[in-house]
Amino acid sequence: GDCHKFLGWCRGEPDPCCEHLSCSRKHGWCVWDWTV
């Protein structure tokens, strides 16, 4: 499963799927900092 620039599944930070985005542990996907 490929990781998308946003809404990509992640398990926590740091996560390579998120690249420069942050991993929202609440929702379990990569998000912009202002949405965490």
Curated annotation (Swiss-Prot):
One of its GO terms (molecular function) is toxin activity. One of its GO terms (cellular component) is extracellular region. The modification Valine amide is found at V36. Its main location: secreted. Belongs to the neurotoxin 10 (Hwtx-1) family. Allosteric modulator of voltage-gated calcium channels. Moderately inhibits human Cav3.1/CACNA1G (IC(50)=5.06 uM) and Cav3.3/CACNA1I (IC(50)=4.32 uM), and weakly inhibits Cav2.2/CACNA1H (IC(50)>25 uM). Acts by making a crucial interaction with a Leu residue in the extracellular S3-S4 loop of domain 1. This is Omega-theraphotoxin-Avsp1a. It comes from Avicularia sp. The lineage of its organism: Eukaryota, Metazoa, Ecdysozoa, Arthropoda, Chelicerata.
